[in-house]
Amino acid sequence: DVDYWLNILPKNKELNNLSTSNNNIQIKKHNFTPIFIIGVPRCGSTLIEKIIASGPQYVSIGEETGILSTLVKQKIIEQKAIYFNIKDMRTELIQRYKEKNLIQQNSNYIFTDKTLDNFFYISLIKAIFPLSKIINCTREPLSSIMSILKNNLPNLPWAHDLDHIFRYFDI
């Protein structure tokens, strides 16, 4: 829904005012080090993810999981705000990443999540996964906008109207 992406989510102040006083997250004595790739669609994020995956260390590839955005949207809809326990949220997120087979021992608990709209959740990501890395993938905006229009992205409700696209880029 366009209203959610352009109005409700960007105005949610709780997402930007989270405590980051959590200790390192450990499960079975292993630290989780996700790599979040953020940006706008058609910004080159797939190339970045492939470069990361081609390195010598095994890294589980998350593509666009939408795990965090789905969970946050669920919390916003259920509670009209997202006051929640970070530890509970962490447990729920780790379980969802495990269900997608992203958290694997042979990857040394490093995985990528290329859900580009995770830029809305940077404070939340750092509170839940303090060891995480965040890569902001950028491209000349006009090139991204033209590519978004040309590719007719069906899963992005805001990507089919030029005014909506400009508003999304202004967030």
Task: Provide a role label for each language-model segment.
Residues 61, 67-84, 105-111, 115-171:
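PAPS-dependent sulfotransferase catalytic domain
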